[in-house]
């Protein structure tokens, strides 16, 4: 029993360190800069990702709130919706490419590395 407790403690510590690693936090910080800047994500999704940006009132359907951490698209057919790959694909190609609304445009003009950083930032917005 003591070995199992030690294993669980070790695994949870490692997971915590990975989740808070400087590279992940740097990616999220870079993602926020793009989200707020050239990505213009906040115009629809809001500064805190709650779907309440200044342009949101004019959109139907309303922009997704990132605070609940629930995403509906399985863009790569792996049977799991809302993975980092799924978020990346929806941001890059737009939700209409996956049967969603055209109100979420694709942003293929943004470099892939910046799109990955935006995904990292969006993950930090979950309550």
Q: What annotation goes with each model-predicted range?
A:
Residues 44-51, 92-96, 106-109, 123-124:
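Detector for the c-type heme attachment site
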Residues 1-12:
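Bacterial N-terminal signal peptides that target proteins for export
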Residues 74-115:
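Axial heme c-ligation environment in periplasmic c-type cytochrome domains
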Residues 56-70, 74-76, 88-93:
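Solvent-exposed helix-loop boundary motif
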Residues 27-47, 56, 63:
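Sequence/structural segment immediately N-terminal to covalent heme-attachment motifs in c-type
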């Amino acid at each position: 029993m003591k070995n199992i407790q030690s294993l669980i403690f070790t695994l949870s510590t490692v997971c915590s360190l990975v989740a808070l690693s400087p590279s992940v936090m740097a990616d999220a910080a870079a993602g926020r800069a793009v989200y707020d800047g050239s990505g213009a994500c906040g115009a629809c999704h809001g500064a805190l990702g709650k779907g309440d940006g200044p342009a949101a009132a004019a959109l139907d359907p309303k922009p997704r709130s990132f605070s609940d951490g629930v995403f509906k698209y399985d863009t790569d057919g792996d049977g799991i919706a809302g993975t980092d790959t799924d978020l990346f694909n929806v941001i890059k190609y737009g939700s209409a490419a996956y049967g969603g609304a055209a109100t979420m445009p694709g942003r293929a003009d943004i470099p892939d590395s910046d799109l990955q950083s935006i995904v990292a930032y969006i993950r930090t917005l979950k309550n």
